[in-house]
UniProtKB/Swiss-Prot annotation:
It comes from Methanosarcina acetivorans (strain ATCC 35395 / DSM 2834 / JCM 12185 / C2A). Binds 2 [4Fe-4S] cluster. Residues 216-240 have a biased composition (Basic and acidic residues). GO terms for cellular component: cytoplasm. GO terms for biological process: methanogenesis. Signal peptide: none annotated. The gene is hdrC1. This is Ferredoxin:CoB-CoM heterodisulfide reductase subunit C. The keyword NAD does not apply. Its cofactor is [4Fe-4S] cluster. PROSITE patterns: 4FE4S_FER_1, 4FE4S_FER_2. The lineage of its organism: Archaea, Methanobacteriati, Methanobacteriota, Stenosarchaea group, Methanomicrobia. It holds the Pfam family Fer4_8. Disruption phenotype: Triple hdrA1C1B1 deletion decreases methane production from methanol, but does not affect methanogenesis from acetate. Deletion results in up-regulation of CoB-SH and CoM-SH synthesis and transport, and methylsulfide methyltransferases.
Amino acid sequence: MIPYVKMMPYVNEYDTPECKTLAETAKKSIRTPESLGLDRCIQCGACTASCPAARFTDYSPRQIVKKVLENDRSVLESEMIWSCFYCYSCNLRCPRNNSPVTIVQVLRQMAINEGIRVEKLAYFLEIGEHLGENGASKVPGAGIKNMEKDLGERWIGIKRKLEPIRSELGLSARDVRNTHGEVQAILESTGYFEREKWIKARVQEKGIRGFLKTDRTGTSCTEKKKNSGDLGFESDREYTGQEALTV
């Protein structure tokens, strides 16, 4: 654990329970199914062989599982656990029903709780601020526009018929009038706002710029405002040019 960093507030004991070993924490996490085959791992490498990230990086689900079984806590500070993008191919291919992707999720949260690699959360600050202020996440405008290009009139037709489609599926009409207050109540009760303050403080300590609201206002970047879709989202906020971190 990094000594000068205060642990994240509202650490969920069910998410990362305090145990003697990494393996026990992974197995007892609320994220983990009872059928997890961690102790049955035979290090066959099927997980790494099927992993898309392993083809282009040094990421190895097999090595991560090995470190967890050996209780090697250096894995919490490893860049490797941030290369997974949760496709679950490793879980699908494992002959022992292990789930390296689930283990990685637990390891990431453990690292964050201890103030390790907090910069990986910087990119998500804007999304979190938007959710807290407006009760909704950001709209992936670029993705929608690309779908229009790929699918043409078919996609436009789907958009126009969205409400009839919802009706056919038995879904209620969209009503977001009270969403903001409800979302804020959930965020408040779960300690989200305290976590957000903690993350912002760590980001500022590390000198990471371009992700806090104060970084995006009152600067010369107004002349270079990014268009909708540069980061895959529509936004009316201003950026300093700092690109998103890959997590």
